[in-house]
Amino acid sequence: EAFLEDSDPVVLGSSAGAMATIGPEAMDSLLGILKNPDCTPFQVGLINLALSFIGSKAPQALLDAADSDVAEVRVAAISALGDQIQTLGDSDAQKKVFEALEDPSPDVRAEAVTLIGKSCDAEDVQELLIKKLADSDSQVRKNTAMALMKLEAKGTINALTTAAKTESDKDVQAVIKVAIKILSLGV
């Protein structure tokens, strides 16, 4: 209740922490808050942290949430699946993140690209990510360039160079150029 009615960051953080320690039983409440149109970005961040903490105890619930009708719930679920992939090597979670690359919501696709950049090996995912350099959403394209850079995917320099030449968004183009520069170091 305090999570919905109080704006004090300390109270919100304490509430999210308490809900995380409750465990899987709190997931429905946390996901329900995400569906509330008055949910603030700060609350979303706290919910994402709580879900990450809970996720290892309720992996199926997160997988189910990744199929929600509500984009904000799918984003949070995809974000929280990262811990399962990194610590548990959960192949179902990884498959769900790969599926999220084709989600109708650009926010979900952007989160999936970011998570792949944090949790996978470059040689396993670089072809998937190269395709996202042509995504219809600029944030997805930016996140893709950053993910390739984070993965140190030197084998994608040619694809990034091609993307930089055809990119119409100057902000995306700048990120792609930084990725090319970083990946070119030591080649």
Where are these regions (language model features)?
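Buried hydrophobic core positions in alpha-solenoid tandem helical repeats
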Residues: 1, 29-31, 61-63, 96-98, ...
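Structural signature of tandem alpha-helical TPR/SEL1-like repeats
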Residues: 88-94, 123-124
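Structural detector for internal amphipathic alpha-helices that build alpha-solenoid repeat scaffolds
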Residues: 2, 10-24, 32, 41-56, ...
